[in-house]
């Protein structure tokens, strides 16, 4: 569905038939569906449309999360915030996703109330249940975590995760002895443990070789008795700091080999992570994720996963459309907004497959690499049921 009222969308789909079901009847029927039915459809769609591209032998996946404000529902304690200091109450869901940067499709997604959100734990679960091989997982500072790095290592994947910079007193970098230079590439071979003894305290003086973890770690014992032997988990990685502008730097950790992936290559790869940020914007505003047609959270789950399927379908249809014109400065790609509309018309039976590709090829936009602008952080709100496009 698009951004109109539920009645408008039903009239649009059924062709203004006088026998059309009412909005109330539609809501009652959708209530009979399992809340996770569309999640299963999304997983099935991903498995059956998995034709990926590789970069230096790796499949590039980005992980990130995004908050979704939904219609106010005090009856859902996992997402409801009463507001404070004069702020109106609101409900938030949290979407965690893995996104293929070269195929430009979502490979996995998890949705829950904001109060229950734990991005790192969710991503660990996504890594564990994935059937993919030769993956390089790229993530931002929210995923700086030894436990997550271990899950990725155990899976046989590679990781590239941005961490808090060396100037920050917290985080992975703060617990290591690093070079004094502005830029560096240091290999660290850490032995992690959750046990605390006098012997271990002496070992931990070598901060680049031994590390005591205060939190639970999935690959170490949950409890440690006094006479139990010390158990270590080995986690080798590089910590790399590189310049991104005249006066700013980024620090990342990775288990990629330095010969194939020197610092400049890591910088390029991490910059590619922006593709998942762009996908969230298109998912919300082009595909219409913010235009819900329900208040019940289980119905909203259906709509979120339906739009993820729609996003993936549109990207798969448009991905072959890259046009290089000899007399033009830029290569051209499909206009995603037009492509979404054409794909919707295809599902409605108004456009045949040959015309879908022809229409998409007719509406293209130039590819302008290297552009950037300051990111404006503003509050996002669910679109009211009252103010909808007719």
Spell out what each predicted region is:
Residues 8:
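Polyanion/phosphate-binding surface patch
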Residues 81:
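Extracytosolic and intramembrane catalytic regions of membrane-associated proteins
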